[in-house]
Amino acid sequence: LVTLRYDVTPELFLYLFFICILYLISITDIYDQMIPDSALLIAVIVRLLWFFVTEPFGWRGLLGLIGNGLSVSLPLLLLVLLMEKIRDMEMMGGGDIKLLFVMGLYIGWANNLLALFLGCLTAIIYGSLKQRKEGKEVYIPFGPFLSLGAVFALLIGDGLIQWYLSLFI
């Protein structure tokens, strides 16, 4: 599907790498309840190297790239810290916030916001069904749902966002 969306272009290889990282993160989160910092760091390094090789925009472009990473992850981090202080319990793991930063580097802020929405929606549906089946509170690893949202946003996010905005313009 990614090849159909991006054809055989240099970006295809970047996005295939990104999907492999998301797969690794998802499997690790499912089995170990953690998102490995090493996978996130490798993804950041590859994306920065890709930027410096392919983007001629210099510092302004680099600030835009970093802004894409921070635009969703930083406000969510602040919200999570506030909610954890109010509720006195862990609301979301730090790996999920870092994953959102990395996702923003690859798919941009708008698609990252879409991926977060889709990740939350699918996690809520899955968690509700699992809790109903088991009859008790259940642990839901969020990384796989964020990854699913990121792949969906990578494939059709731009078109979906354009369509949504056209409803208001």
What are these regions (language model features)?
Residues 1-9, 166-169:
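N-terminal transmembrane signal-anchor/hairpin module of polytopic inner-membrane proteins
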Residues 14-124, 163-169:
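Functional transmembrane core segments of multi-pass inner-membrane proteins
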Residues 94-95, 130-152:
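Interfacial loop-to-transmembrane junctions
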